[in-house]
């Protein structure tokens, strides 16, 4: 982008608002992006604000992050090949993480806080098959109290007091999308507060687009987010060409 003269700004966005609340017939409102130190006019806005992985909050989690504590089996599972691994979570994401890790781990322990693994039927059946093979073990009504190790994950301590040797632990208890800026403009969210987009990466609000982990798309990978952003860019260019955007 910089080779074409596009300026890059490293500023925290505080607010995005419509420039004109009631634009004249035949025109559409542009947007004003407010940062901590400036305001910028924009004919379209792409929200690529991402999401935060929901943290477990156990002692040792922060210290050992990227040292055996991970939030993405697809990203990091292969680094711990042959080791005993664990997954914390009780939903479909946890089931899918465990299944993926079972291809790399000597064994996968799944710690479920409740009394049921609430996975999609197909994934539930696949987990049961792996349990029968001895590749996965599911521990119900079980919570991790502490993640232990000096320079890497070595053990997990359960709230029951039991300690288990572990080479890696994957936290799969959900994500927190950073969608508030978009929501304030009337952008539609799903029940997980992810931004709803269509195949053009458009939101329900004209001129507003979204891409990456903040969206309701299934796969949360850098390459898929990049593809969504490219798609949004094409359609934003088309939008600007078809509409007269005004700021007053």
Task: Please annotate each region the language model reported.
Residues 89-91:
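Glycine-rich Rossmann-fold phosphate-binding loop(s) that bind the pyrophosphate
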Residues 94-95:
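N-terminal Rossmann-fold NAD(P) dinucleotide-binding loop
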């Amino acid at each position: 982008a910089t080779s074409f003269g596009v300026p890059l700004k490293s500023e925290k966005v505080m607010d995005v608002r419509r420039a004109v609340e009631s634009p004249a017939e035949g025109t559409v409102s542009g947007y004003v992006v407010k940062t901590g130190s400036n305001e910028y006019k924009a004919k379209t806005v792409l929200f690529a604000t991402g999401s935060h992985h929901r943290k477990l909050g156990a002692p040792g989690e922060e210290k050992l992050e990227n040292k055996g504590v991970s939030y993405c089996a697809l990203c990091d599972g292969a680094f711990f090949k042959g080791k005993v691994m664990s997954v914390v979570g009780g939903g479909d994401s946890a089931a899918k993480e465990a299944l993926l890790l079972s291809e790399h781990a000597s064994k996968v322990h799944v710690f479920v806080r409740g009394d049921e693994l609430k996975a999609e039927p197909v994934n539930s059946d696949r987990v049961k098959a792996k349990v029968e093979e001895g590749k996965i073990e599911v521990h119900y009504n079980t919570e991790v109290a502490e993640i232990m190790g000096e320079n890497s994950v070595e053990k997990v301590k359960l709230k029951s007091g039991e300690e288990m040797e572990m080479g890696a632990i994957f936290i799969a208890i959900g994500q927190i999308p950073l969608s508030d800026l978009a929501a304030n403009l009337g952008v539609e969210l799903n029940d997980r507060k992810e931004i709803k987009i269509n195949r053009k990466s458009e939101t329900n609000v004209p001129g507003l687009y979204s891409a990456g982990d903040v969206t309701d798309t299934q796969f949360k990978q850098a390459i898929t987010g990049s593809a969504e952003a490219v798609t949004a860019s094409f359609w934003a260019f088309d939008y600007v060409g078809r509409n007269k955007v005004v700021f007053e």
